[in-house]
């Protein structure tokens, strides 16, 4: 069945002299094309993902490539049934990705060698290499390369400290690194080199490029890839599907993410529909009884019902 929409994932490190002006012009163009998505702009470049029809996305790619410094930008493209976003945002940030370094890394000056998907696939099977996932823990939990090391981090900016604390795991090895589309690895691999690690390379175009490449078709990837749009998760491995995600409550195989019903928590957890219903869409007892619980409000549950449900159905106060 033909899909009428596309999602574009892209980034480019290139100097932008006036990010605010660039943002305003960019937002105006995106709105003129009825595109939806999220784009970050900084003095160091652009990082975006957006959705639109075939014609709209073609026009956008032509537009961006027509701008000085963006002529060779690499777009990762997914065909989808509908828009993957509900709004259009273009925002200015200090950095495209935040490593919170005292001495920032400029990927235009130092970054790891780009490995095409087939090269990365071959390196994955080399016993002298270790593979570090440069994403957050909840992204890893949904899917990752077989044998990859999981940094226990909630935010990208925590990665350098985690590496320093765990350097014995890979100090004598060649390091491979990867992320969703490549933007985080540009800085992370450069930082690794500056720190003196032996970096074998970074996956060019990220997991997305690896999954769509005819040379690899996602081999040695387990689970799904987390994406920052309304799809939440997409398939990568075209040859087999190994579920690695586990239900937060039951530890059973699960690939369904929800946000905790407590808006002050908002923790992302993997939960089946049955678990979501049983635990009122919340990660803990405190979140279940929170006065602003979104799950409770959405289902018009009374306080008495919530307390009775907890007393009758939950043996432990998870």
UniProtKB/Swiss-Prot annotation:
Record-linked PROSITE patterns: RHODANESE_3 (PS50206)
GO terms under biological process: tRNA modification
Keywords: Oxidoreductase, tRNA processing
Record flagged with keyword tRNA processing: yes
GO molecular function: oxidoreductase activity, acting on paired donors, with incorporation or reduction of molecular oxygen
Record EC number: 1.14.-.-
Pfam families per the UniProt record, alphabetical: Rhodanese, Rhodanese_C, UPF0176_N
Domain of life: Bacteria
InterPro entries: Rhodanese-like_dom, Rhodanese-like_dom_sf, Rhodanese_C, TrhO, TRHO_N
Membrane-spanning intervals of the chain: none
Catalysed reaction, written as an equation: uridine(34) in tRNA + AH2 + O2 = 5-hydroxyuridine(34) in tRNA + A + H2O
Domain Rhodanese span(s) in chain numbering: 125-219
Active-site residues from the entry: 179
UniProt cross-references to PANTHER family, sorted A to Z: RHODANESE-LIKE DOMAIN-CONTAINING PROTEIN 7-RELATED (PTHR43268:SF3), THIOSULFATE SULFURTRANSFERASE/RHODANESE-LIKE DOMAIN-CONTAINING PROTEIN 2 (PTHR43268)
Family: Belongs to the TrhO family.
Known function: Catalyzes oxygen-dependent 5-hydroxyuridine (ho5U) modification at position 34 in tRNAs.
Stated name of the protein: tRNA uridine(34) hydroxylase
Source organism of this protein record: Acholeplasma laidlawii (strain PG-8A)
